[in-house]
Amino acid sequence: MQQTKKLTQSDIIIAVMSGPFLQRGEPALISKWYRTKMALTNGVDLVVELPYAFATQKAETFANGAISILNALGVSEICFGSEDGQAENFYNTIAIQKNEEETFNRLVKQFMNAGNSYAKATSEAFLHILPPEKNVDMSQPNNILGLQYIKAILLQNSSMQAQTIKRFASHYHDETFHDQHIASATSIRKQLFNENSSSTTIEPFIPKMTASLLENYKQNYGTLHNWEKYFSFFKYKLMTMSSEDLQHIYEMEEGLEHRILSKIQNSSSFYSFMEALKTKRYTWTRLQRACTHILTNTTKEEIHKANIEQHAPYIRLLGMSQKGQTYLSRNKKKIELPILTHTKTFEHPTLDIERKSNAVYFSIMQEPLRTQLLKQDATHHPIRYDEITKKFL
């Protein structure tokens, strides 16, 4: 956050955040409301939600939804973390893909026919066309997403400029701590679910207020969220579904439904299920997203109605600082998308999916807490934070 402010010299910081389920195909560690508090206490002025229909997607669709929201809010610069750290290299890679489209597509097809995933095939294709020093390593997840952010900016004819901050020490998927002060999100999540680890283990790697809110969530709700918490629901659902039922689920490719139904039979945990399910063709993240759609019963028809090829249909405001509130007041007439401060009365196919995913997310809670949280999510107004006094209002 400090680097973003230094790099962009921004007046305000706006964060677009996924809701209950994430782009890598798993439940968020804690609710979006607690994550909003974390963002506000760490310098963000406006926190808005990226709907499930965009958030649990491949990088291209995820980026398209996020950029459309930021564009509507009048953002002048986007800043993202990447393994590369040079925005120019992203533009070079996009230019090569466009100028060498025929060669690029041929190479991607060639590498996929060799049994590689699309992400791996794309990475190899770029390396065959562009020298490594001018090319973005497309095997890295943050680089993949960063490239799609810039492509979305160009596609939407936005005047937004792109900046990127190089990730140091830990890569996105690193599972262990290699540095005294920097840790990957994956390693932090792993430590939080380690029975032999306490919350103090991760304190050197996250802001003090973030650690406090994390502990507060555990005390109030008795759990953190990961796939294992939902596995019994997931397995039960699959045991009651046929291959024909699964074919209606979004992102279910022909043949994958048979493999899923076969591997679930003898799986005693989500991890063991994924280990049995994965192949060279399907990445772990790609399979997790398919599993998320099974868990939430998100169908191809529902996503079609949500019309994800277009921009996000609304802006769900989750939280704001005093500065953020002032920005919205001054610019609300320029913002073409409806801004939702709650979802109780608004109707849209995208929001129908959102309501369902929230219900599933809270399903692991005990009653009456489960019902209370679900009701609150629809009526919850944006969290307000005074950045001067550092207090929630």
Swiss-Prot record:
MF annotations from Gene Ontology: ATP binding; ligase activity, forming carbon-nitrogen bonds; tRNA binding
Enzyme Commission identifier(s): 6.3.4.-
Localization per Swiss-Prot or TrEMBL: Cytoplasm
Domain of life: Bacteria
Keyword line: ATP-binding, Cytoplasm, Ligase, Nucleotide-binding, RNA-binding, tRNA processing, tRNA-binding
GO biological processes: tRNA modification
Family annotation (PANTHER family): TRNA(MET) CYTIDINE ACETATE LIGASE
Protein name listed in UniProt: tRNA(Met) cytidine acetate ligase
Organism, as annotated: Bacillus mycoides (strain KBAB4) (Bacillus weihenstephanensis)
